[in-house]
A protein has these predicted regions:
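Conserved N-terminal boundary motif of the eukaryotic protein kinase catalytic domain
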Residues: 2-10
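Conserved catalytic motifs of the protein kinase core domain
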Residues: 25, 95-96, 164
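C-lobe/activation-segment region of protein kinase-like
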Residues: 51, 117-131, 136-146, 155-240
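ATP-binding glycine-rich loop module of kinase domains
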Residues: 15-70
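Conserved structural core of kinase catalytic domains
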Residues: 72-130
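Active-site ExK catalytic segment of metal-dependent nucleases
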Residues: 29-35, 101, 170-172
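A short glycine-rich, hydrophobically flanked beta-strand micro-motif that places a catalytic Asp/Glu
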Residues: 82-89, 144-157
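Feature marks short, surface-exposed loop/turn motifs that line or immediately flank catalytic pockets
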Residues: 36-38, 93, 106-107, 172-176
Length: 240
């Protein structure tokens, strides 16, 4: 069965992909390649020698699926305390889509990114504690990742608005040429510690920009939050 997504409004748009609420499961999302930005376009933008790689190496969905399979095999269930789950591929009218866990707040709304939370509320005491918990987990478990970007982390909140946890939804996997699992554990931990330190630097930079009139960039903003109270009479989400 092919999922029909073209008539739906994506809730998020990245540089390479669109994210839709799964039509049959509100607890999952479907990530598809943006039709206006092909794999050929991505390869063309890369310089030598990266532009010599096969097209499949530029497919974010294939890479994410590979990485998530490896993380689950290595860490088991505990990785999903701070990382969203991956459920494999499905056919859509945009081509192959990757199905992932859709993190929602206690009130049913899609969880906002850490970037948006910090912009709206600043580094509150409970947010600081949540960032610390994520950082401690990342370093102790030596989770392999690229840079921990603020728009790739979501803040899951309880029904009363308090923070339940932070969840990394993108940017996972080894950032170097050598797979992280091949390195000594102490070196893996040091690499993870640098990623956490860089996260704190990004938080400080964003907090310094809060006096601006406009949100910095479009990354980190939801196109809609799919809150049950925000649906129109036909059941579709209403844009903010």
């Amino acid at each position: 069965m092919t999922l029909q997504l073209a008539q739906l409004e994506p809730f998020a748009r990245g540089g390479n992909r669109l994210c839709f609420v799964h039509p049959d499961d509100a607890g999952r999302c479907v990530k598809v390649r943006r039709p206006d930005f092909t794999l050929e376009d991505r390869r063309r933008k890369k310089g030598f020698p990266k532009n010599l790689k096969p097209l499949s190496s530029f497919d974010d969905n294939l890479e994410e699926s590979r990485v998530m399979t490896g993380l689950e095999k290595r860490y088991g269930e505990r990785i999903f305390r701070h990382v969203s789950r991956c459920y494999g591929f499905v056919d859509t009218d945009f081509g192959k889509g990757l199905v992932s866990e859709l993190i929602r707040d206690g009130n049913g709304a899609i969880s906002q990114t850490l970037k948006k939370y910090l912009w709206d509320h600043g580094l509150t005491e409970e947010c600081q504690a949540a960032v610390q918990a994520l950082g401690d987990f990342w370093q102790s478990q030596a989770v392999p990742s690229r840079d921990l970007l603020l728009h790739n982390i979501v803040v899951q909140r309880n029904n009363d608005g308090t923070i339940e946890r932070l969840v990394v939804i993108d940017g996972l996997g080894s950032s170097g040429l050598i797979p992280a699992g091949w390195l000594p554990h102490s070196l893996q931990q040091r690499k993870s510690a640098r990623k956490v330190a860089n996260l704190h630097e990004r938080i400080d930079i964003l907090l310094g920009q809060r006096g601006q009139d406009t949100f910095p960039g479009f990354h980190g903003l939801l196109l809609h939050d799919d809150h049950p109270d925000h649906h129109n009479e036909k059941g579709g989400p209403v844009s903010p």
